[in-house]
Amino acid sequence: MSELKQAAAPEQALVVGRITSVYGVKGWVKLYSHTEPMQGIFDYKHWWLKTPSGWKTVELSQGRLQGRGLVASVKGYTDRDQVKDICGMDVYIDAAELPELEEGDYYWSQLEGLRVITKEGVLLGKVSQLMETGANDVIVVRACEGSFDREERLIPYAPGTYVLNIDLEQQEMVVDWDPEF
């Protein structure tokens, strides 16, 4: 019998990964992690899963690096047929569980949704996501109501160079970026 328990939604639900598929025959699953480093997902023992019938919680039993990916065992799941039900689900934690950051450091989830404004005051859009590339992380800015145009922009996340200011209270990011580019 599985340990999928009905639960209230986390105060601030934050996706930290995804259960991608079954691994082996003893109830293990493969994981895709959004944490840095990727094994950081194992620091959170209680996971929330958003199911069609509401929020459920599961408890991480074990986790490890397997090849170039991650695998985990969830408490109460002992065979592959049981874990099939949770494959494809995002893994959430409560954002309150995240460690405190130093001033000027941000979690990507804090930046998603911020309005992006040039230093001249032109609204370019909102941060839809961030991407990891080889050199710099990149901010994906999508047009929103009131934005300069309907273009999507890719702006290097380079604080002090392109990113001039981030104000979480005002939900704004000021950038040094030509709106025509």
Curated annotation (Swiss-Prot):
One of its GO terms (cellular component) is cytoplasm. One of its GO terms (biological process) is rRNA processing. Gene3D superfamilies: PRC-barrel domain, RimM. Keywords: Chaperone, Cytoplasm, Ribosome biogenesis, rRNA processing. It comes from the Bacteria. The keyword Coiled coil does not apply. Residues 103-181 form the PRC barrel domain. It is found in: Cytoplasm. Transmembrane segments: none annotated. GO terms for molecular function: ribosome binding. Binds ribosomal protein uS19. An accessory protein needed during the final step in the assembly of 30S ribosomal subunit, possibly for assembly of the head region. Essential for efficient processing of 16S rRNA. May be needed both before and after RbfA during the maturation of 16S rRNA. It has affinity for free ribosomal 30S subunits but not for 70S ribosomes. Belongs to the RimM family. The PRC barrel domain binds ribosomal protein uS19. This is Ribosome maturation factor RimM. The gene is rimM.
